[in-house]
Design a protein with these regions (language model features):
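Short, conserved charged micro-motifs
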Residues: 103-107, 233-237
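N-terminal beta-strand motif that seeds the catalytic metal site of vicinal oxygen chelate
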Residues: 22-50, 92-97, 142-180, 222-229
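Vicinal oxygen chelate
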Residues: 2-29, 108-165, 171, 193, ...
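Alpha-helix initiation/capping motif
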Residues: 4, 67, 100-103, 125, ...
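Conserved short beta-strand elements that form part of the metal-binding/catalytic scaffold
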Residues: 59-93, 101, 134-142, 188-223, ...
Length: 272
């Protein structure tokens, strides 16, 4: 087969681009994420904390098969996880994003070229941002691991709200622009900025990650999170939450509720 001059030039022009195209295809950054899936807590009494959420979102709570016992409450396609520390101040210790076609070893190597250290195994791997906030990755569809079993049903009543999944996670940091630069690596360009208070939003599928300025004298931390729920009667849900002893917080709009959980964290519930 004899190639024309035009065909030869076309082949030569395409050849150097092939490795570049393959490298671009292999990159996992920004993440092809299906969203923020769960948040994890360190609390004095994990069973009590899980039971609190269970009464509101899913009465059947779960636990690890073996000690140290972590407890879980499902939130539709997401969940909240509670690990024990009897003497530590309660804190939200990590949040997790699920990733389509996640390849751990390749991600670890790719992040190493950016001086970001990803540690752990396929079951639990995570990195920390410049302020020590921990972010975990799991392969889509995520969910509870095989080591987790049904624990107990905390009430015979129906759930007060029908959870769909996480809605957002709010991280408070000392330098918004520095943190935004870090999270662009994983979620791409921010999708919104707000004033009063200043807030930067990143979109992760149907969920969002928000950055806020941490208060003077406080350490950087995961401050609060939101849960998407099926459409609800606000007045009826408020009545049931108050009947369950839940402390409600001010909120505006018929589709938004805010409350304080048993460990003092603010939870925001948004109807869809």
């Amino acid at each position: 087969m004899v190639l024309t001059r035009r065909e030869m030039l076309a082949m030569l022009a395409a050849a150097p681009a092939a490795p570049v195209a393959l490298a671009a295809q292999a990159s996992q950054l920004p993440l092809n994420t299906s969203g923020l899936e769960h948040v994890g807590f360190t609390v004095p009494d994990p069973q009590k904390s899980a039971a609190f959420y269970g009464r509101i979102f899913d009465p059947q709570i779960f636990q690890e098969m073996k000690p140290p016992l972590r407890y879980y409450c499902r939130l539709g396609i997401g969940y909240v996880a509670f690990g024990p520390n009897a003497t530590a101040t309660p804190r939200i210790d990590h949040f997790c994003a699920t990733v389509e076609g996640y390849r751990l070893d390749e991600m670890r190597a790719e992040l190493a070229t950016r001086s970001i250290r990803l540690t752990g195994s396929p079951d639990f791997n995570a990195l920390t941002d410049p302020d020590g906030i921990r972010m975990q990755f799991m392969t889509t569809p995520g969910g509870l691991l095989p080591t987790i079993i049904a624990s107990t049903r905390v009430t015979q009543d129906d759930a007060i709200c029908e959870a769909v999944g996480l809605d957002h996670v709010i991280v408070q940091v000392p330098d918004l622009e520095k943190s935004a630069a870090f999270y662009r690596t994983f979620f791409g360009k921010e999708t919104a900025r707000e004033r009063g208070p200043e807030r930067i939003w990143f979109t992760a599928a149907r969920t969002r990650l928000g950055l806020e300025q941490v208060a003077t004298g406080q350490m950087p931390h995961i401050d609060r999170f939101g849960i998407r729920v099926a459409a609800f009667n606000r007045r009826e849900v408020i009545r049931k939450l108050e009947g369950a002893g839940v402390t409600l917080l001010p909120a505006t709009g018929e589709k938004l509720l805010r409350f304080r959980d048993v460990d003092g964290f603010t939870v925001e519930v948004r109807g869809i």
